[in-house]
From Swiss-Prot:
Class of enzymatic activity (EC top level): transferase
Record-linked SUPFAM superfamilies: Nucleoside phosphorylase/phosphoribosyltransferase catalytic domain, Nucleoside phosphorylase/phosphoribosyltransferase N-terminal domain
Ligand binding (5-phospho-alpha-D-ribose 1-diphosphate): 101, 104-105, 109, 111-114, 129-137, 141
Keywords: Amino-acid biosynthesis, Aromatic amino acid biosynthesis, Glycosyltransferase, Magnesium, Metal-binding, Transferase, Tryptophan biosynthesis
Official protein name in the record: Anthranilate phosphoribosyltransferase
Annotated positions binding Mg(2+) 1: S113, E246
Keyword Transferase applies: yes
Family membership: Belongs to the anthranilate phosphoribosyltransferase family.
Sites where the protein binds Mg(2+) 2: D245, E246
Organism field: Shewanella denitrificans (strain OS217 / ATCC BAA-1090 / DSM 15013)
Length: 361
């Protein structure tokens, strides 16, 4: 027994020394490799890193600027530690889509990407929406869904079944990434953005092949699209919409598009997508209960024109990326047509019923 304890202690000491050596590398201003970054972040989510050391590490990364390899390694660690999400042969064959943003853009808009997820699902995509509570807005994706009667803690097996039957499942981040809680006190104490602010969209347990990913700064377009490529994502659009982490209705959208290893950068305008541009004020959101009413109205084809179009252009780009449509313009047309049918609202009500049935069972 003593021998076992001694061996465990020795292993722990070796791991601690290895982590300290990597931290020293960071403090000297050097970048980490992907595997080195994975090692440090695995220590964080396992609860093994001292909070002071963690704070120093996060600040060192922030001050130098995180590299693609460091972000990818961090994502590797969090994905490996996540609760597994089972994928059926059907969803593996067709591929899975996520429509997600980093948050933190500073605008309190309606829940565009979450509402767009219902539209994309109704139009034929398989959407595994990974989300959390609000960061920069009053209403994050999970806040909205709760007010739509959709449970957040559906088992992975049940969520996977919804993905197959309804074309949509919602994966509540804290339900799958319990180890991230170890970083919360340090992040709160630092009161500044760190690498964790961009990791959320990169650690979907469903490991989607297709992604529409909004970022809060144009400086993130190139790093994030390269991370998605390194993580094995097949097709993606990383977008920055004139201040929003969405495809913009009020201005131009900068795009970094990934297509099976090839990356290109370009701009999109609302007019190119087939809609009229509209003032950002028309997309202002409210409390989760308010946003839930807005989402339900949009999905029933009753929303205000600007709200409808903002959702349609995001759903349209997602439909293009997932291969349902052959262009962003065709995707937007399909999204607008889908909204008129009310099928997207049917997906919402069916997902709510499924989550409530599981909760009662």
């Amino acid at each position: 027994m003593l021998t076992q304890v001694s061996a465990t202690q020795a292993d722990s000491n070796q791991a601690s020394q290895a982590s300290q050596a990597l931290l020293d590398t960071l403090y000297q201003g050097h970048a980490l490799t992907r595997s080195q970054s994975e090692t440090l972040f695995a220590s964080i989510v396992a609860g093994d890193m001292d909070p002071v050391a963690m704070a120093g590490m996060l600040v060192a990364l922030k001050m130098r600027g995180e590299t693609t390899a460091e972000i990818t390694g961090a994502a590797d660690a969090l994905r490996s530690a996540a609760k597994p999400f089972p994928r059926s042969a059907d969803s593996i064959s067709t591929g899975v889509l996520d429509i997600v943003g980093t948050g933190g853009d500073g605008f309190n808009t309606i829940n565009i990407s979450t509402t767009a997820a219902f539209v994309a699902a109704a139009a034929g995509a398989k959407v595994a929406k990974h989300g959390n509570r609000g960061v920069s807005s009053k209403s994050g994706s999970s806040d909205l869904l709760t007010h739509c009667g959709i449970g957040l803690t559906m088992s992975p097996k049940a969520a996977s079944a919804c993905l197959d039957t309804l074309g949509l499942s919602f994966l509540f981040a804290p339900h799958y990434h319990e180890g991230v809680r170890h970083a919360v006190p340090v992040r709160q104490a630092l009161k500044t953005r760190t690498i964790f602010n961009i990791l959320g969209p990169l650690i979907n347990p469903a490991k989607p092949e297709f992604m529409l990913l909004g970022v809060y700064s144009p400086k993130l377009l190139a790093p994030i699209v390269n991370v998605l490529n390194a993580l094995g994502v097949k097709r993606a659009m990383v977008v920055y919409g004139s201040g929003l982490d969405e495809v913009a209705l009020h201005g131009d959208t900068q795009v970094a598009e990934l297509n099976n290893g090839d990356i290109r950068f370009y701009h999109l305008t609302p007019e190119e997508l087939g809609v009229e541009r509209a003032d950002l004020n028309l997309l202002t959101g409210g409390e989760p209960s308010d946003n839930a009413l807005i989402t339900k109205a949009i999905l029933q084809g009753k929303g205000e024109a600007a709200q409808r179009d903002a959702v349609a252009i995001n759903a349209g780009c997602a439909l293009y990326i997932s291969g349902i449509s052959d262009s962003v313009q065709a995707g937007t047309k399909l999204a607008l047509a889908t909204l008129k049918t009310g099928k997207a609202f049917d997906v919402l009500t069916q997902l709510a019923e499924a989550s409530q049935t599981e909760a009662q069972g």
